[in-house]
Amino acid sequence: MSKVWLITGAGRGLGVDIANAALEAGHNVVATGRNTDRVARALGKSADLLVVKLDITKPTDAESAVKASVDKFGRIDVLVNNAANFYAGFFEELLPEQMERQLSTSLVGPMNVTRAVLPVMRKQRSGLIITISSTAGLIGFEFGTAYAASKFGVEGWTCFRHPS
């Protein structure tokens, strides 16, 4: 049975690979990104594909993307929280705005999308949420303070989200 996959950050890198793999396996895909032209160019056209604008830092965008997904395909079976960014540098040289953007995109963003998807999955009484993290969430690295902080947060959030 085909599933409906909602994938964030589907305009490049791993997001493109995940979306293509799901499409090739016969699933329906809602591919999201801030730049829908980039997402559409990366994935091409398919009756099984819906491209939706989504800035994961905006809860209203997440709600709209979920609504568009359900309107088109009737359900969401798999959420892949893939979108992220990366600010590198010595901690004291990173601007406060860069730290905020890093945490907003890589930590709060997946929370926004998951919060919007959960009511759909609870109503269906099924669903799978995959949140892409990094080894930076387990062990920090030079010049990666902002990124590691966001990924340590993701690791903690996903560990304690499971029972609820």
Locations of the language-model features?
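Active-site helix of classical SDR
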Residues: 114, 150
